[in-house]
Amino acid sequence: MGNYIRLSLETHLFFARIMKEHALFLTAGFQCKEKAWIRRADMFYKQFESLHRDVVMVSDKRVGKEILDSCELITEHTIPAERRTQQLSGVQIDSRITMRQQALSAGGDNCEDRNMMPVVTRINQRALQLLDGLISFKENLLQEMSEARVYNANYPLLIKHIIREAKLYRQLVCELIDNQDISKKDLQETENFWNQIMMEHALFIRGLLDPSEVELIDNADCYAVEYRELLEAAREQDCKAGKMREESLGTTLRFSGFKEAGTEGILECKIASIIMPLLADHVLREANHYIRLLQSAENEEECMMETSCSCEDHCKNHCDNHCEKPKENACNCRR
């Protein structure tokens, strides 16, 4: 039960913020004459902001330290980026939610509160309903843009990108509702998903920088190439899983540093671009989320290896002490 509560709240703390920001970026990207589209995008923004607010209000001492320390939920730049983006876009952003989130404390291993079960279940069901609407809205927008029926300042690839992220969120919520857990997916599948997301971030950054920012454009292009090579190696199975994870982690740690420097530069007006400050912080948080996933998988693998070695040593000692003729490979222990 505690795991269900913790995983649900952690999932929404990250993804509900991401979804409300998607709606904000779409709202800001429409022409003034597209009043109906703006109203619908703003409606989704307000609905996900309300969901996010409600999740934050019940998350104190019910989520893990790992996610609070990962800088995937908020960074030191989030509030300044929200305030600057509100000034630039005219979209009202409730930064009090971010302030409350900053004050959250960990306690994910001690959340056996039966009263929270129905609360969390309602949150999951509410998120699922909102996601169905938001995904449909994004897909309709992409179709209309492809037929030149509506203009939005965001790339069509960015619309596809945020549809995939919304569908991942929906998939995770469905798993929580159906199984009260999140299934352990093939790590390669997770890496491929997020390497694709990171590659597209690099492409978006490259395309939104001012042409005068030659060095930053070159750096962004290099990251796009690195992630493309990782995806190609995965498709061709040219790399062992452990080595692939190591390369993905190393690249993403560097890319996170690049994004953080970019966020600071945009907030300080030192970088010429048309990148919204909150978009810069948004893609930084997604990189930090991916880093946590990779590091968690690495830590789990190390624990499994240690447990396996300990088990084999125990069995070998047992056989040496109690068997007349110890046999090679006699260990039948399972983790």
Predicted regions and their residues:
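Surface-exposed peri-terminal alpha-helical interaction modules
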Residues: 1-335
